[in-house]
Amino acid sequence: MLDGGTVERNCRVPANVALLVPLINNVWLSTPGDPAYGLYPGDSRLAGYARELRSHVACVRPARVLSLRIDGRAVAGLDRFGENLAFFAAQVPSGGVLGSDQALLTPNVDSGYYAIFRPLPSGSHRLHRIAEDGFGHRQDVTYRLRVG
């Protein structure tokens, strides 16, 4: 995982749209050189690689730091937004991940914390998240949102 550092982003959000915000996560995308490449969840051959794949993303949970503020108000109980070790397939376009040809990458695994919340009222909003994983990778991101 790359250390995200501190960043500010300006975003436009349509009215009446719920937001899914990654607080901190780590993703492993399998590529053609990986031993498990092309295996799907449920394939008996995947079991042998599952532990290794999980180890690539396990550093995220539990998070050392997890903070989210919306318009200055803290969101409590962020630990309940954890998602642990979800396997998935990802369709990538030509020239996508690592300059690859169009492909269906599998197996992939993700672990992290995500918050989803109701649409914000029209107008300007500030969303600020700070998170640090088990390896000390820290992200401090401010989103200045214009809704409507």
Please place each PLM-identified region on the residue numbering.
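Extended, well-structured beta-strand/loop surface patches
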Residues: 61-124, 130-148
